Amino acid sequence: MTDAMPPATPHARPHAINPTGCVLVLVDYQHRLMPAIDRHADVVADALCLADAARVLGLRIIGTEQNPQGLGPNVAELRERCDTTLAKMHFDACADGLLDLLRTPNGTPLPDVVIAGCEAHVCLLQTTLGLLRAGYRTWVVAPACGSRTAANHTLAIDRLRQSGAGIVSLEMVLFEWLQTCRHERFRAVLPLIKARGPGQVAPGA
């Protein structure tokens, strides 16, 4: 990065996700990998919900693929929702050019990253640590992350929390992106919230 950003600090500070300076990063939802992921159907469904909400709200979506020649591309439904997809060999996508993609057209870094992906304890973990080192406020959507075992998922989320990432649910992200039930796109996002929720009435519905 050419523009210095302040070091990331733990998310104990009272920051909400900034919907006007945010990008969604979806890490390595590759079709050859997903069948081995614990809860893989729910993991992919939550990632699709994130991507659909981001598209409705006009947020950029960046996908990554680890060694796509070996593991294949991301699942088609997710790949087609991404504005761009970064092929990489490092487990940390920041080492293969992700930081260059986290900028506005005039080159200004977008300060907030919402991230989810697989595997939680490998590429998702290392990419998030790279973002934190680079100074990005980073939120990890835990239910949309997956590992082959639940234990590795839990350990990854615990470590990321200790490292300064914000750990959030799907609904936390969507409602912080919206901020108010008077948002002009609230009614467009509401069906996505209801589709992934237990059927309760969403705030402001």
What are the functions of these language-model segments?
Residues 31-36:
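Short acidic, Gly/Ser-rich segments with clustered Asp/Glu that frequently serve as metal-coordination loops
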Residues 37-38, 44-127, 195:
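Active-site alpha/beta core segments
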Residues 76-77, 98-102, 149-163:
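Active-site-proximal loop->helix
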Residues 84-93, 159-171:
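A glycine-rich helix N-cap at a beta->alpha junction
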Residues 92-93, 122, 145-150, 174-175:
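Short gly/pro/ser/thr-enriched loop/turn and capping motifs at secondary-structure boundaries
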Residues 114-117, 136-150:
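A short glycine-rich beta-strand->turn/loop micro-motif centered on a GG-aromatic cluster
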Residues 166-199:
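A charged, well-structured terminal subsegment
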